[in-house]
């Protein structure tokens, strides 16, 4: 299918979107509308962009796709938490969890499909690493939960499958997309990254200008035990 080779429109920068709007013969203000639909309202199709002319939406659909994940499995627990298995267009699947409580919605996302860290107690590491996720694929997990529950996400924890600091640059990009006032606008302190302890990237994370939250999974305070785990 031809659509497999088309780029995901959400990977374009605001400048690139403006260029596309201009090339398709649309007035400049359409770029702002497009930005709002893509990154503030987080739509997953061109049909949802109701204030754009139908002909323009059809033009966009000829040039771009939404490479959003498909929900393969959803488990709902008694407390309302939902666990999803989400599959990306290339067939790679990851787990995501939505945890609603009064006036709040926390989401736990994966940063890699599989993991190379080899922690003894962790099921994810048994199969090794398939691939790292892109920042957009991390954000897509958050958007999926938000749309499924019909609620705004108030916090995100990077504690699903994978080691975020083994995919550092994309993790930081995802944090900034989630934090952006032109995106999901989640406060930096409500975005938490959990690492099993990749020291150079802990330092790099601490040097970021934003006040993102760090959680370190020590497994044990005793170094010899920790080495075994």
Which residues does each predicted region cover?
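Alpha-helix boundary/capping detector
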Residues: 43, 47, 60-61, 86, ...
């Amino acid at each position: 299918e031809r659509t497999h080779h088309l780029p995901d429109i959400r990977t374009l920068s605001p400048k690139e979107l403006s260029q596309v709007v201009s090339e398709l013969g649309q007035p400049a203000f359409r770029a702002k509308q497009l930005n709002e639909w893509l990154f503030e309202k987080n739509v997953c199709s061109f049909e949802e962009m109701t204030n754009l002319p139908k002909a323009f939406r059809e033009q966009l659909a000829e040039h771009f796709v939404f490479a959003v994940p498909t929900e393969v499995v959803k488990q709902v627990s008694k407390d309302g938490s939902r666990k999803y298995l989400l599959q990306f267009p290339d067939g790679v699947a990851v787990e995501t969890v939505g945890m609603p409580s009064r006036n709040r919605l926390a989401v736990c996302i994966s940063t890699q499909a599989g993991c190379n860290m080899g922690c003894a107690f962790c099921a994810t590491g048994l199969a090794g690493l398939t691939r790292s996720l892109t920042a957009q694929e991390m954000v897509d997990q958050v958007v999926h939960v938000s749309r499924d529950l019909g609620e705004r996400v108030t916090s995100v924890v990077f504690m699903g499958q994978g080691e975020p600091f083994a995919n550092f640059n994309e993790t930081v990009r995802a944090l900034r997309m989630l934090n952006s006032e032109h995106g999901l606008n989640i406060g930096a302190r409500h975005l938490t990254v959990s690492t099993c302890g990749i020291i150079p990237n802990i330092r790099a994370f601490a040097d970021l200008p934003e006040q993102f939250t760090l959680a370190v999974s020590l497994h044990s305070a005793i170094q010899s035990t920790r080495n075994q785990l």
